[in-house]
């Protein structure tokens, strides 16, 4: 069942959208809703979800404000729920995007050893960078919110830094999944490293390791002014196909 509504109170516009499923149909998303309001140059959006047993899968919101030069958002409430688990979020958190291609942030969400943080950090040049720091994130719990989630599990960690100026973009860092498994069958410890830069052209350098052994490296450079714009090299030292079998049906 899908219900929706809009109501006006002076300059404020309230809205909601709710879906409810009958027993036996998507029981992990028995009830889901989106609601909030808009007033002038400010607004709020809230999302919630419960399973058939009444457990909250997620409950969080965003306070948003905007003007002719930027958009600012903050996560609410101070005790949001993600992946059926209670988290905490730092007071006064914010994400700001300036239309001149600039981002500022101070967001730190935690649950036990799990962390999701986005922060402004000093950059190599005149502009600041944005750092994404994820540690100990349980993939299985997060995917469990999806109606037809694949049976994937593991622990996600990320340390990525994004640098932006009006003329260039740089992305560098690492992503790891410890004890990645599919349908409770182990695949391995996966690590992915990336460096990417865009200015007058594009340059990328990536590597992939599995259980500490390098299985793929890619290096590329694209310059439109060259006779052969793309220079790309990929190396596969050796990929253990037996481990890849965990993703294939029996």
Question: What do these predicted regions represent?
Answer:
Residues 1-161, 165-250:
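Interface amphipathic segments
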């Amino acid at each position: 069942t899908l219900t929706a509504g809009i109501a006006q109170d002076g300059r404020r516009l309230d809205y909601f959208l709710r879906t409810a499923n009958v027993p036996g149909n998507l029981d992990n998303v028995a009830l889901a809703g989106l609601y909030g309001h808009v007033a002038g140059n400010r607004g709020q959006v809230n999302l919630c979800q419960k399973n058939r047993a009444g457990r909250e899968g997620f409950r969080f919101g965003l306070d948003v404000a905007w003007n002719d030069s930027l958009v600012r958002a903050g996560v609410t409430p101070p005790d949001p729920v993600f992946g059926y688990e209670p988290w905490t979020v730092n007071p006064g958190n914010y994400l700001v995007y300036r239309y001149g291609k600039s981002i500022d942030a101070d967001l730190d969400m935690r649950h036990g050893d799990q962390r999701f943080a986005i922060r402004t950090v000093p950059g190599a040049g005149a502009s600041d960078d944005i750092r994404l720091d994820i540690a100990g994130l349980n993939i299985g719990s997060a995917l469990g919110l999806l109606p037809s989630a694949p049976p994937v599990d593991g622990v996600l960690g990320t340390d990525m830094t994004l640098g932006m100026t009006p003329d260039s973009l740089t992305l560098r860092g690492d992503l790891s999944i410890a004890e990645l498994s599919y349908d409770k069958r182990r695949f391995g410890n996966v690590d992915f490293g990336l460096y990417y830069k865009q200015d007058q052209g594009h340059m990328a350098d990536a590597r992939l390791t599995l259980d500490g052994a390098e299985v793929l490296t890619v290096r590329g450079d694209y310059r439109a002014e060259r006779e052969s714009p793309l220079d790309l090299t990929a190396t596969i030292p050796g990929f253990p196909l037996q481990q890849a079998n965990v993703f294939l049906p029996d």
